């Protein structure tokens, strides 16, 4: 997707996956469009225009993360989601806040590398097919002369060998042409072939993560990988699987990793989106100050320079955070946005409040999005030859149950529907392979039968739904 989408078009695209929350969609659409507008400015002014970071306020399960994730996917921007509670102050054991930028760059490198490999895929597949032909019809190894004197006294014999060798080479070449034709026509897809692949090195240093090594801006495994020789092992695969492995190897040879790295850093700096969840958990609770509050404030102060704009060292090189879009989110049940330190509040000038989901919202979530739950379950049961249908009243009943359980127990938003739908269709999903019916219709009576008693019993609701 192009970044030249208008705010209205962006909102329409988000509407395909997320129900309601117009204000939040509007805010992120404007932020994305501003990036496009900034790219059209002259270089001097472009550096001065920084993104307006967004603070989303709303309960869990109303679409905060999904809005940011879908936005990034819409324009092919690198996106990472981090939880503020996972970070610790500099000097303490745990993840330092700069790791979010390193994660973003890793994501960006992966995106760019994937795109570059897709660009050379056709050439790589041609090379892979050539290698497959050579593996399926191996050439005869030429014999080397053991004694140099044979050059002087073995002339006639050598001439005969050369003639025979030429005949053999022609025969192999002819056979390879035949195999290449069969490969091109998909006639050898199930043939077995032995290939050599790089053996995955075990991650020796995973246990050290978070113990200060991350602050070095590099992964020790990568640092030592150049010292440890890469081992190769033989694998026997079907031709169709071997082609994928060989195509991947050939594509990696065709791309320039230095170019990938430079483009990835530029993409992360100019288009990256970092979503900081649970930011309310590191705000002061408004009660008397405690050591926990001091620690939380330390994390806020560590986040501040990254959000303001600084340079973070990564294993790919220095990365500037000045133009990365930060979207922070939190429920703010126990704390208020004003409980964040003033400097950090000022770095999130756009605030949007996401509303709790109503019964009507639940109805829309069940049927409208492209990835709606009902569409998913219908597709799953269609694989068993069963046409699953829901009456409008049944959908309404499911939405009412979800809303009621959210009201009487913890409000987990749209995630409640996953639990309810799984419980509702549990027996059907279990019995599906043995059912002889072609069509099953879910009615309000069926919903009441499966969920009614559980909803009425608060204790059961807390444990089951």
From Swiss-Prot:
Entry GO CC: HslUV protease complex
Localization (cell): Cytoplasm
UniProt keywords, alphabetically: ATP-binding, Chaperone, Cytoplasm, Nucleotide-binding, Stress response
InterPro entries: AAA+_ATPase, ATP-dep_Clp_protease_ClpX, ATPase_AAA_core, Clp_ATPase_C, HslU, P-loop_NTPase
Gene3D superfamilies tied to this protein: 1.10.8.60, P-loop containing nucleotide triphosphate hydrolases
Cytoplasm among keywords: yes
A Pfam family: AAA_2
Listed SUPFAM superfamilies: P-loop containing nucleoside triphosphate hydrolases
Molecular function (Gene Ontology), one example: ATP hydrolysis activity
Broad class of the protein's primary localization: cytoplasm
Binding site for ATP: 19, 61-66, 277, 343, 415
GO biological process: protein unfolding; proteolysis involved in protein catabolic process
Family designation: Belongs to the ClpX chaperone family. HslU subfamily.
HAMAP family according to UniProt: HslU (MF_00249)
Subunit structure: A double ring-shaped homohexamer of HslV is capped on each side by a ring-shaped HslU homohexamer. The assembly of the HslU/HslV complex is dependent on binding of ATP.
Function: ATPase subunit of a proteasome-like degradation complex; this subunit has chaperone activity. The binding of ATP and its subsequent hydrolysis by HslU are essential for unfolding of protein substrates subsequently hydrolyzed by HslV. HslU recognizes the N-terminal part of its protein substrates and unfolds these before they are guided to HslV for hydrolysis.
Name of the protein described by the UniProt record: ATP-dependent protease ATPase subunit HslU
Taxonomic lineage of the native organism: Bacteria, Bacillati, Bacillota, Bacilli, Bacillales
């Amino acid at each position: 997707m192009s970044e030249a989408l208008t705010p209205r078009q962006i909102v329409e695209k988000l509407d395909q996956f997320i129900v309601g929350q117009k204000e939040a969609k509007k805010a992120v659409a404007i932020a994305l469009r501003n990036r496009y507008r900034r790219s059209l400015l002259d270089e001097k002014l472009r550096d001065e225009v920084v993104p307006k970071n967004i603070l989303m306020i709303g309960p869990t399960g109303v679409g905060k993360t999904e809005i940011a994730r879908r936005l990034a996917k819409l324009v092919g921007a690198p996106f990472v989601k981090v939880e503020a509670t996972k970070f610790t102050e500099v000097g303490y054991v745990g993840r330092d806040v700069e790791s979010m930028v390193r994660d973003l760059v890793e994501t960006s490198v992966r995106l760019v590398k994937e795109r570059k490999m897709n660009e050379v895929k056709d050439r790589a597949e041609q090379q892979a097919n050539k290698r497959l032909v050579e593996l399926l019809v191996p050439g005869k190894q030429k014999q080397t002369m053991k004694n140099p004197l044979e050059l002087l006294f073995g002339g006639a014999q050598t001439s005969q060998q050369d003639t025979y060798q030429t005949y053999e080479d022609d025969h192999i070449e002819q056979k390879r042409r035949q195999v290449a034709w069969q490969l091109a026509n998909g006639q050898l897809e199930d043939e077995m072939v032995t290939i050599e692949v790089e053996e995955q090195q075990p991650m020796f240093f995973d246990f050290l993560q978070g113990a200060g090594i991350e602050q070095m801006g590099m992964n020790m495994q990568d640092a030592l990988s150049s010292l440890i020789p890469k081992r190769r092992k033989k694998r026997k695969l079907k031709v169709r699987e071997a082609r994928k492995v060989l195509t991947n190897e050939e594509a990696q040879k065709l791309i320039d990793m230095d170019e990938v790295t430079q483009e990835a850093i530029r993409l992360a700096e100019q288009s990256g989106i970092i979503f900081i969840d649970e930011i309310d958990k590191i705000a002061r609770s408004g009660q008397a100050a405690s050591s926990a509050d001091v620690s939380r404030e330390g994390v806020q102060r560590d986040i501040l320079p990254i959000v303001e704009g600084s340079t973070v060292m990564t294993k790919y090189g220095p990365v500037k955070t000045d133009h990365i879009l930060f979207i922070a989110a939190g429920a703010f049940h126990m704390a208020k946005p004003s409980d964040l330190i003033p400097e950090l509040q000022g770095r999130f000038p756009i605030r949007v409040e996401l509303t709790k989901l109503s019964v009507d919202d639940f109805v829309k979530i069940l049927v409208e999005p492209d990835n709606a739950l009902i569409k998913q379950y219908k597709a799953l049961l269609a694989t068993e030859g069963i046409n699953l249908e829901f009456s409008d009243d049944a959908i309404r009943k499911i939405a009412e149950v979800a809303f009621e359980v959210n009201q009487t127990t913890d409000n987990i938003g749209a995630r409640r529907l996953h639990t309810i739908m799984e419980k509702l269709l549990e027996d059907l999903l279990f019995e599906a392979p043995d059912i002889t019916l072609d069509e099953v219709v879910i009615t309000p009576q069926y919903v009441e039968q499966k969920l009614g008693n559980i909803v009425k019993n608060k204790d059961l609701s807390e444990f089951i739904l």
